[in-house]
A protein has these predicted regions:
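Intrinsic-disorder/low-complexity, polar/charged segments enriched in Ser/Thr/Lys/Arg/Asp/Glu/Gln
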Residues: 12-18, 25-27, 63, 79, ...
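Short beta-edge strand/loop motif at the mouth of beta-sheet-based domains
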Residues: 16-17, 36-77
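A generic structural micro-feature
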Residues: 9-11, 56, 74-78, 105-109, ...
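Short amphipathic alpha-helical signal-transduction/dimerization elements
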Residues: 157-168
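Hydrophobic/aromatic beta-strand elements that line small-molecule binding cavities or substrate pockets
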Residues: 19, 53-54, 79-86, 110-125
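Hydrophobic ligand-binding cavity/cleft-lining segments
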Residues: 1-49
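Beta-strand/loop substructures that line and gate deep hydrophobic ligand-binding cavities in soluble
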Residues: 94-154
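Hydrophobic pocket/interface hotspot
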Residues: 28-29, 38, 64, 84, ...
């Protein structure tokens, strides 16, 4: 697997998204690296992480691997194979995901994912206040899948918001 930097990618193939949370950067960072929290929120609508498939080693070079299963049709599954390549608590998580082959094994095709967390003023459904601005950068992704990918992330962040609100 050949590595690359997000900055070296064609801008048309890079998805960027900004989301604001009424939570601290540390709380959000923990939700990405704590297995007990991660399985509660991650996944697009109607998809769940299968808990016993999760391997989460939150160190540079560590693995983040799991299978997501469709809630209404369990025959639909999606394996995920990632490696942490950069971590700076509670500000940065960066992965490289090896896309699965048709047989469900990791391939040599890599996609980068960077999550940056910055404390600041957040505007949420509850109003304006102290919170965290999350900046997501992902690619290379063909432009045709940007909308679907963004919808999946927004669905996941609805779950993360519910988890964070429940812990208050």
């Amino acid at each position: 697997m050949q590595d690359f930097t997000i900055e070296s990618l064609d801008a048309k193939e890079v998805l960027t998204y900004r989301h604001e949370f009424a939570a601290t950067p540390q709380e959000i960072y923990n939700a990405f690296i704590d297995p007990k929290l991660f399985i509660k929120w991650f996944g697009p609508k109607d998809w769940n992480v299968v808990p016993n498939t999760l391997t989460l080693e939150p160190v540079n070079g560590g693995r983040k691997q799991f299978v997501m299963k469709h809630r209404h049709n369990p025959k639909f599954q999606a394996p995920m194979y990632m490696r942490f390549i950069a971590m700076k608590e509670p500000e940065l998580l960066e992965y490289r995901e090896a896309l699965p082959t048709p047989q469900g094994q990791p391939s040599d095709t890599l996609v980068a994912l960077r999550i940056e967390l910055e404390e600041g003023t957040a505007i949420t459904e509850d109003g304006v206040g102290k919170g965290t601005i999350l900046k997501l950068t992902q690619g290379p992704l063909p432009q045709e899948v940007h909308e679907q990918t963004l919808t999946s992330w927004k669905d996941s962040f609805v779950g993360l918001t519910k988890l964070l609100d429940a812990s208050k």
